[in-house]
Amino acid sequence: MSNANDTIELLKECNAGVKMGVSSINEVLDYVKDENLKSILISSKEKHSMLGDDTHAMLSKYHEEGKEPNPMAKAMSWIKTNFKISNSHNDSTIADLIVDGCNMGTKSLYKYLNDYSDAEEKAKDIAKRLINIEEKLITDLRGYL
């Protein structure tokens, strides 16, 4: 039997993850040189955004708002991104940064799926779809590492 609280919390974490993913991609897009890499990142950003819309729609059924990414995690990501890019303006560095972010994101999402195991199947499906988007992006970026 599903638990509304677990459902809401899982959706909020997915929402924060989507926002973090979109923000991270936006941070690096202007530095990407390879058009194919840029296309991969833009496509992934669009998939993240669409999933964010699904998350918002489901949260609104519970009269809940989305969740912002952890401010400390966002700040650390910004610092790491800007430091690495300032030292190395190449696509390999950008791919490495995004892959690291995806790995952290998927790890967190698997943890949230376990923590909120009584969530509605529809919410679990959103989390799994986000994991799939992140894992596909990792696979797509391997050639740029």
Describe the residue ranges of each PLM region.
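Alpha-helical scaffold segments that form or flank carboxylate-/histidine-based iron centers
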Residues: 6-14, 35-53, 91-97, 122-133
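Carboxylate-rich helix-loop segments that flank metal/cofactor sites and access channels
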Residues: 46, 57-106
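Hydrophobic alpha-helical core bundles mediating ligand binding, dimerization, or RNAP-core interactions
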Residues: 25, 55, 76-80, 109, ...
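A generic hydrophobic-segment detector
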Residues: 107-145
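Localized chelating/binding microdomains
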Residues: 35, 69, 140
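Amphipathic alpha-helical coiled-coil segments
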Residues: 51-61, 88-91, 136-145
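Alpha-helical bundle segments that constitute or directly flank the non-heme di-iron/ferroxidase center
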Residues: 2-32, 93-117
